[in-house]
Amino acid sequence: MDTDFWLQRWQDGQTGFHQDEVMPLLQKHWPALQLPAHARVLVPLCGKTLDLHWLAAQGHRVLGVEISPLAVTQFFDDAGLQPQRHTSRAGEHCIAGPIEIICGDAFTLDASVLGDCTAVYDRAALVALPAALRQRYLETVYARLPAGCRGLLITLDYPQAEKAGPPFSVDAAEVHALFGTQWKVQELEHRDILDQEPRFRADGVTALSTGVYRLQRD
């Protein structure tokens, strides 16, 4: 993962990927996971997403992971929260109520951190990684999640040659190839969103869809 790239994006305020509302697809499809309210939910590469607050409001314990200290600070400042802080090998832990964000590299997390995460919400992580890093991401993050872990994965699918990521295109075939050996994959929704994303159209992208997948580890 190109840490310097993401740190610079946050420093320069180039955060067009941040949404000022909770992701509607999260609200629509999260119930399909049928999780108990107290489940601990991993949100890798979380930025300062408002989705963390929504997940906490469902009764979950939320564990975000974010490389940018600025993003972590902005998340808590925007919510008027004063997190408690401590450090570990994983990074700096910032905790306020049911929400914890580790400011560190998701690729370095081990089972001691991830072992009790019974759910994962991946809207911005897999699509942020170039193809060469995605298998490693599965092997270093998803592989350390416990058996029975359930997840909601949201992807983008567009002709990669028409636009340089991130976010990158990850089509249904790649999702099944990446997860298929250790995870059950169920496609919940796949729809065209090009008209809703003028930045992609302005970049010359001719087709754009989003995919939503329910994951469950064997």
From Swiss-Prot:
Pfam families, alphabetized: TPMT
Catalytic activity: S-adenosyl-L-methionine + a thiopurine = S-adenosyl-L-homocysteine + a thiopurine S-methylether
GO molecular function list: thiopurine S-methyltransferase activity
Superkingdom to which the source organism belongs: Bacteria
NCBIfam families recorded: PRK13255.1, TMPT_Se_Te
EC number(s) stated in the UniProt entry for this protein: 2.1.1.67
One Gene Ontology cellular component annotation held by this UniProt entry: cytoplasm
Keyword terms, alphabetized: Cytoplasm, Methyltransferase, S-adenosyl-L-methionine, Transferase
GO terms of biological process kind: methylation; response to metal ion
Protein family membership: Belongs to the class I-like SAM-binding methyltransferase superfamily. TPMT family.
Location(s), subcellular: Cytoplasm
Protein name stated in the entry: Thiopurine S-methyltransferase
Binding residues for S-adenosyl-L-methionine: 10, 45, 66, 123
Chief place where the protein resides: cytoplasm
